[in-house]
Regions:
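Structural signature of hydrophobic alpha-helical transmembrane segments
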Residues: 28-34, 80-92, 112-114
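Membrane-interface transmembrane-helix boundary segments in multi-pass integral membrane proteins
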Residues: 19-36, 171-175, 179, 190-230
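Membrane-interface helix caps and helix-loop-helix hairpins in membrane proteins
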Residues: 75-85, 104-108, 129-141
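Hydrophobic cores of alpha-helical transmembrane segments in multi-pass inner/ER membrane proteins
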Residues: 31-42, 93-103, 146-158, 217-234
Length: 250
């Protein structure tokens, strides 16, 4: 009986290990496929909606995003831990901004979602920081639902509803991000945590691996993000100016 129990325990451990999420495994590719199809569908829908229809869809998706985000936050409290229960990761702020953007479609919320979602949240699709069970575990579902919905919000509002970032949007998001980084870095230093990976580099593979050791990667990443965000703003401003100026008198 003891031998059988040991064998059963070993089998359960093996099955559990096999169910762990694997980067670019079948479940990861499935998420990417759902993301691509959903993004295309949202753009198609967004371009054909009336204002009332867009408001209704936005509020439905805002409630969905908020419900999932709230569930994730509640889960992080059991048991409470200073290292994971405080919503200081940029993902937390991006999700809150996406909820506001879905619901209100206000420009400040759109700006945060556009820059944070399209550059930072998409990193979860490429190099997910997910250490845990694979589909259909609730941690897997919560992680991917949050990140996918944030990026979907940015895509829907930009290419579906045709909202556009401005240079003032760029400046606003840079300032907000720097304030978040300063507050979070200070909190990490006092509490011994690593929210935002500002005080210690990720242990899983990520783009930070090619940016040097700490604190070099912070400077490298900041410079790169600021440049990329500027490049994400410039084309829209180029398009907007001729339209605003209109035909010039001869």
């Amino acid at each position: 009986m003891r031998t059988g129990s040991n064998e059963s325990a070993e089998l359960m451990e093996l099955l559990s290990a096999e169910r762990q999420f694997s980067m670019y495994g079948p479940s990861h590719w499935a998420v990417i496929a759902v993301f691509v199809v959903g993004a295309g569908l949202l753009v198609w829908i967004g371009r054909r909606q009336t204002e009332a229809q867009a408001r209704r869809l936005g509020r439905i998706l805002a409630v969905l995003t908020a419900a999932i985000f709230g569930s994730v936050l509640i889960y992080s409290l059991f048991p409470p831990s200073i290292g994971r229960s405080v919503p200081l990761n940029l993902t937390d702020l991006a999700t809150a901004a996406a909820v506001c953007a879905w619901w209100s479609q206000r420009h400040w919320a759109f700006a945060l979602t556009y820059y944070w979602g399209l550059v930072l949240s998409t990193q979860a699709l490429i190099t997910p920081v997910l250490r845990g069970p694979d589909f259909p575990d609730y941690r897997f579902l919560g992680f991917w639902a949050i990140h996918v919905l944030v990026v979907w919000a940015a895509i829907y509002l930009t290419w579906g509803r045709r909202m556009r970032p401005r240079w003032r949007s760029y400046r606003f998001v840079v300032v907000v991000t720097l304030i978040w980084a300063a507050v979070t870095f200070t909190f990490n230093s006092i509490a011994g945590t690593d929210y935002g990976f500002l005080n210690t580099k990720l242990t899983t593979r990520s783009l930070l691996d090619i940016m040097g050791p700490w604190p070099v990667y912070l400077l490298t990443a900041t410079t790169l993000v600021v440049i990329v965000w500027a490049l994400m703003t410039w084309p829209w401003e180029r398009i907007r100016r001729p339209a605003k100026q209109g035909p010039q008198p001869v």
